Amino acid sequence: SAAARARRLSESAEIIMFERGEFVSFANCGLPYHIGGEIQDRSKLLLQTPESFLARFNVDVRVMSQVVSINRQTKTVTVKNLIDNNEYNESYDFLLLSPGAAPIVPPIPGIENPLTHSLRNIPDMDRIIRTIEMNKPEHATVVGGGFIGLEMMEAFHQRGIKTTLIEQANQVMTSVDKEMAGFIHEEIRNQGICLLYTSPSPRD
């Protein structure tokens, strides 16, 4: 991470890292495997905690803390504690903004349905598991045929849920060539999973 790299560059600098969520570092590619039951112990998904980050890198990690404003003149940030809603100011010499990414949610009707989920972090994973346990779905649709999409497809299938995978492109795993993707398509269908993707043009 940037904080760990900053520590390697300076052993004496005071480094503070603010994280809006509860978790610092986790195995995001492992999230579907916990949903599917292959990884039973949820704690194995955690790569670093605030305590381990402090012990290893001497970095002050403050989770559940959201930076709500930046004052470049005074070189301070206003931080909101999301547990008690109190706000305080913290000074800085150098400020690095690394807010991360968010899933692309297509603007389609029904996307706000509570049974519709995205998977980016551990809270997302927990919500999906709760939905499965509470609603006992017979069918699940996965939108997106990248790494996480394929892993989620497999997770639902392993839980005995009839699964459909939808990919906007003309193949899953667009990072591989069409011949390799063809083998993946064949295996998906051999597992009894419905695969839908854009039909290739006659020139392809």
Predicted regions and their residues:
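Amphipathic alpha-helical segments in well-structured domains
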Residues: M125, M180-A181
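Conserved small/polar residues in nucleotide/adenosyl-binding loops
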Residues: Y197-D204
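Helical element adjacent to the flavin cofactor pocket in flavoenzyme catalytic cores
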Residues: I184-I193
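FAD-binding core/adjacent interface of flavoenzyme oxidoreductases
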Residues: E51-A140, S199
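N-terminal Rossmann-fold NAD(P) dinucleotide-binding loop
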Residues: G149
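Glycine-rich Rossmann-fold phosphate-binding loop(s) that bind the pyrophosphate
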Residues: G145-G146
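Beta1-alpha1 glycine-rich phosphate/pyrophosphate-binding loop at the start
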Residues: S1-V61, M153-E179
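Secondary-structure boundary motif
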Residues: R8, S12, A55, R130-P137, ...
